[in-house]
Structures are given as structure tokens and as C-alpha cells.
Amino acid sequence: MDHLPIFCQLRDRDCLIVGGGDVAERKARLLLEAGARLTVNALTFIPQFTVWANEGMLTLVEGPFDETLLDSCWLAIAATDDDTVNQRVSDAAESRRIFCNVVDAPKAASFIMPSIIDRSPLMVAVSSGGTSPVLARLLREKLESLLPQHLGQVARYAGQLRARVKKQFATMGERRRFWEKFFVNDRLAQSLANADEKAVNATTERLFSEPLDHRGEVVLVGAGPGDAGLLTLKGLQQIQQADIVVYDRLVSDDIMNLVRRDADRVFVGKRAGYHCVPQEEINQILLREAQKGKRVVRLKGGDPFIFGRGGEELETLCHAGIPFSVVPGITAASGCSAYSGIPLTHRDYAQSVRLVTGHLKTGGELDWENLAAEKQTLVFYMGLNQAATIQEKLIAFGMQADMPVALVENGTSVKQRVVHGVLTQLGELAQQVESPALIIVGRVVGLRDKLNWFSNY
């Protein structure tokens, strides 16, 4: 270990920055946020320093580096564009045993500045020891996506409850189980973020009053249309907190690779060599695992409330009194159309969009007359086996035979394939495509030749 990571208490302590440019301004902002009593020494200053000085936030000393400014300092930063000056600052600080950071010169510095994720009072610092700042920044960005913005509020509130928790729960094990429940409670986190004091108090009292081995909960998460980059941040957070993930065939392997490693996984979809698990059995799996006290994530392709039968699954949980929440996902219609260069609406061609299931309950029938109307886009989910019928019905109810159509197979993934033609070819085109696939019908499909961007990657 080349550097010891420490967190410095600088509030109301003297610190010095030498330099008055953009880099110095970024360092000054950090020290001011930490509450330092800051002096900045430079030949010239960018305007932001004057603003801060006029507001009484720092002291400016205009002129060459004056090493006597270090005499009362706890910490210094050399941030000029002159290597000689920076080295003088470093040497002067070293002789006084003052920690000094030298921007872009880690070997000349006695401490380095990490990339910071600020969820005060929770702080995360990432450093490559000065060898690869870009790598540290990229890692910080990944960690940023995993840590909700309101996490600091949750941590601060936890501090207020520590004495009560210690008083109510006698053993370390009981306290640990309480805090585990506390920190994964989405209702509490959202209430804190919304400054809803009534909801915060109600949720807190519920956490304290319920048994530590109480029933678990189910989170219905939309995984998006395929590309793992389209999974929402909240969806990612949920699958990394899950005890068990119940998933279907439309969830890509890339997304499943993001699931917490020690979480149990239950596959309930149809693939080669597997039989589709009946919906009622899926409902019972969710119910059974939640009743064991587990945090269950039901992971579905697309959005769980758009032809995902999410409502049916939640009704079962509701009847049993199991807590649940929903994380929306990007639905296939939106993702597949965007990755195919097909805008679902356009002022010249489509003023509305209809999302239609091609898989009806026995005896069901679609409203073909309205579906055949002009100036709209139709998106059929699960319609591949009914493509010939869709073609026949739309033409019979008045849709023009030359209406453009597209079928998107494995949309948004590296395996995406798009075939397109006109309505009279729909049944034939469907024979060239394998599930999962989406059918798009409308004049907007004609824009694909100009707007298709994904195939160029």
C-alpha cells in the first residue's frame, strides 16, 4: 500500500492553496465544502475566487508565493501551472511537516486527492495512487450509480436512531438484523428524500414494532428491452440487494451478470429444454419466498406493467399482505424502436401510439376498426405467431396494403435483427424472424433508412 487513505477534519482549520486558475478553483471548492478556513495565494485569480472573497468565504493574497503563509496551516495544495513554484510550495510545506498536494505531480506531493463520492455523512474515496486518474474517475462513476443520492439522508437519520436501537435490541445480532432492514427499506429512503416527516415516523415505528424475522418483500423490477445499459439505476440497486431473483427468458445474460453473486436465482421462463412455469406457480414462488423473510426481486424484461402480467402477480401478494414495490423499466416498444431508427411518433405521420398484445385470452378479439385508423403507430407484443392474422385483419378493416411494417428480433442487443416491408408481406416476413420479436406497423417505419444508427456501430 503506497498511500494510507484517511479522512481529514478541516473545519475551521487554516489551509493554503497556491494558484488562482481553474484547477485551483476546483480544489478550493472541495476545501470550502469541508469547512476549511482557506487562504489562496496567486499572481492572478479567475473571477470565482473574487466572488468567494467578497462573500467572506476565503482570503486572497495577490502576489508571488509567500511561504510564511504556511506557518499556521494544517494542509496545502500547489496548483499553479509553474512546476518550479509548485516544487517550492512542496519543499516549504515539507520543512514545516505540513501535508502538501501537488497537482499532477504525485511524486512531489505528501498526499494525493482521490475521486470522491459525497453522500455526507457517507463518503467514498477512490484512488489509483496517481498512476491512472482516468481509471479512478471511471470507477467513481460506476460507484455513483450504485449509491442513491438520498443515501446520506438515510445515514444521517440512522445516526439519530442509534441510541434507541441500542436500548431496544439487546444483542449485536438483533441490532444487525434491524439495521439490515432499515437500510434496504425503500419507503423510508423515499420519505426522507421527500422530507415527509409523517411518513418517516410511521415507517420508523413499523420497523421498530415488527418482529426481526418478519415476512420479506417483493420488488417487481423491469429489466428493460435487452441492452444492460438500459437497466435503470434503481433496478440495478434492487437486483444487487436481492436475496432471490425470479426471472424470465427476456432478461438478458448481461443483466443477470449484474445480480448479487450470492443471491439465489429461479428461472421461470420458456427456453429450449425448459417448460414454461404456469403463472399461478410463479405467483406462489414469490409468495412462498417472501414469507420466508427474503427480499425477492421479480425481474421481467421490458416494463413489468406493460404486457408483463405484473399486476396479476402483485394482486396475489396484496391478498396475502406481503409488502411490494415496483421499479419501472424501458418497455420493448420504446427500446426496440429507438435502436431500429423508428420514431414511434412524428408530426407528419403518427400522432398516437398503440401498444397491442398479439396474445389474447381464449375468445378475445382486438378492436381492429380502430387499429386500422390513419396517423398512428401500432406496436404488437407477442404477435409473431399471429402475424398473418394481423395482416389479414388490418387490411380487411381498411388499412392500406402498402403500410410499412418492421419486425425487430432481439431488440437493443448485439443480436438485433430488423426485417421490414409492407403490410401485405407481414405474414411472410414473420417466417424469417424468431422470438423474441416485436412488430411495428405505421408510416414511421419508412424513416428507418435515414434514422437507423444502431447498425452502424
UniProtKB/Swiss-Prot annotation:
Modified-residue entries (Phosphoserine), positions: 128
Which Gene3D superfamilies does the entry mention?
Cobalt-precorrin-4 Transmethylase, Domain 1, Methyltransferase, Cobalt-precorrin-4 Transmethylase, Domain 2, NAD(P)-binding Rossmann-like Domain, Sirohaem synthase, dimerisation domain, Siroheme synthase, domain 2
Give start-end ranges for the coiled-coil region(s): none
* Example of a GO biological process term: cobalamin biosynthetic process
EC number(s) per UniProt?
2.1.1.107, 1.3.1.76, 4.99.1.4
Reaction catalysis annotation: uroporphyrinogen III + 2 S-adenosyl-L-methionine = precorrin-2 + 2 S-adenosyl-L-homocysteine + H(+); precorrin-2 + NAD(+) = sirohydrochlorin + NADH + 2 H(+); siroheme + 2 H(+) = sirohydrochlorin + Fe(2+)
**Pfam families in the cross-refs:** CysG_dimeriser (PF10414), NAD_binding_7 (PF13241), Sirohm_synth_M (PF14824), TP_methylase (PF00590)
GO terms of molecular function = NAD binding; precorrin-2 dehydrogenase activity; sirohydrochlorin ferrochelatase activity; uroporphyrin-III C-methyltransferase activity
Q: Where is this region: Uroporphyrinogen-III C-methyltransferase?
A: 216-457
Residues reported in the UniProt entry to bind NAD(+): 22-23, 43-44
Active site at 248 (proton acceptor), 270 (proton donor)
Q: In which pathway does it act?
A: Cofactor biosynthesis; adenosylcobalamin biosynthesis; precorrin-2 from uroporphyrinogen III: step 1/1; Cofactor biosynthesis; adenosylcobalamin biosynthesis; sirohydrochlorin from precorrin-2: step 1/1; Porphyrin-containing compound metabolism; siroheme biosynthesis; precorrin-2 from uroporphyrinogen III: step 1/1; Porphyrin-containing compound metabolism; siroheme biosynthesis; siroheme from sirohydrochlorin: step 1/1
What are the alphabetically sorted keywords of the record?
A: Cobalamin biosynthesis, Lyase, Methyltransferase, Multifunctional enzyme, NAD, Oxidoreductase, Phosphoprotein, Porphyrin biosynthesis, S-adenosyl-L-methionine, Transferase
Residues where S-adenosyl-L-methionine binds: 225, 301-303, 306, 331-332, 382, 411
Which intervals of the chain are annotated as region Precorrin-2 dehydrogenase /sirohydrochlorin ferrochelatase?
1-204
The superkingdom listed in its UniProt entry is Bacteria
**Family label:** In the N-terminal section; belongs to the precorrin-2 dehydrogenase / sirohydrochlorin ferrochelatase family.
Q: What does this protein do?
A: Then it catalyzes the NAD-dependent ring dehydrogenation of precorrin-2 to yield sirohydrochlorin. Finally, it catalyzes the ferrochelation of sirohydrochlorin to yield siroheme.
Please identify the protein, giving its name as recorded: Siroheme synthase
Q: Which classification does the entry list for the species?
A: Bacteria, Pseudomonadati, Pseudomonadota, Gammaproteobacteria, Enterobacterales
In the UniProt record, the gene name given for this protein reads: cysG
